[in-house]
């Protein structure tokens, strides 16, 4: 196990201790999936094992790319009919979408009611036209594991990636997405743990076979379902 994974596990354990009282109270009374009123998907708003934060904690690999909108591009390829490289201008010319959704981090915190603006992932898929045998997506960020050329990657089933609330966002709460949170563009996956949404997104590949990403190769769950407490590979 590398140092990065050990640090992340220690962080999670600290969060559990800091919020032990509220978690213990909830655990005695909440349904197995979580607590709170049903969200728009019919599940408890707060997934099991999570606590609510009002700020937006920053977590990364230790590499925070400084990519201007003039430099930023999104390469989209793999098994598609029309591979493209989008500039910032191209990206903003695509149909824009707004959504309000919750953000669930595997490190046990959730932030509710985030107002996003960006491009739905399904719009990207429609643009490039995946081949019939495509079942998976691999997203790659501009960031790398420090001291290496290993980029951040994460995998998502195509069926999940093209859901209505999966976006490539450039705006949060009415302001440009902050650099520390993945700006100028990051992916968000509201029904999965947030590591499934690559920050500083740079490339998307459409694949026939699943390919595990950075954290998935290091012991994190491949499916990442917050309401199943699905944090680590079994």
PLM segments and residue spans:
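Structured, non-membrane catalytic/scaffold regions adjacent to prosthetic-group chemistry
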Residues: 2-234
């Amino acid at each position: 196990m590398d140092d990065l994974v050990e640090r992340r596990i220690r962080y999670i354990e600290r969060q559990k201790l800091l919020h032990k009282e509220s978690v213990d109270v909830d655990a005695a009374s909440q349904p197995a999936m979580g607590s709170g009123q049903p969200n728009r998907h019919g599940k408890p708003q707060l997934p099991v094992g999570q606590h609510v934060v009002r700020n937006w904690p920053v977590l990364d690999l230790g590499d925070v790319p400084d990519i201007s909108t003039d430099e930023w591009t999104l390469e989209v390829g793999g098994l598609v009919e029309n591979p493209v490289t989008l500039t910032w201008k191209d990206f903003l010319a695509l149909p824009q979408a707004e959504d309000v959704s919750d953000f669930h981090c595997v490190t046990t915190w959730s932030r509710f009611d985030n107002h996003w603006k960006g491009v739905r992932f399904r719009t990207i898929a429609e643009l490039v036209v995946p081949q019939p045998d495509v079942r998976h997506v691999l997203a790659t960020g501009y960031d790398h594991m420090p001291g290496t050329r290993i980029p951040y990657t994460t995998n998502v089933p195509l069926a999940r990636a093209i859901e209505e609330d999966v976006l490539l966002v450039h705006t949060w709460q009415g302001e440009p997405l902050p650099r520390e949170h993945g700006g100028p563009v990051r992916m968000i996956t509201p029904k999965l743990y947030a590591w499934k949404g690559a920050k500083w997104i740079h490339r998307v590949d459409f694949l026939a076979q699943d390919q595990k990403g950075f954290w998935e190769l290091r012991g994190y769950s491949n499916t990442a379902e917050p309401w199943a407490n699905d944090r680590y590979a079994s």
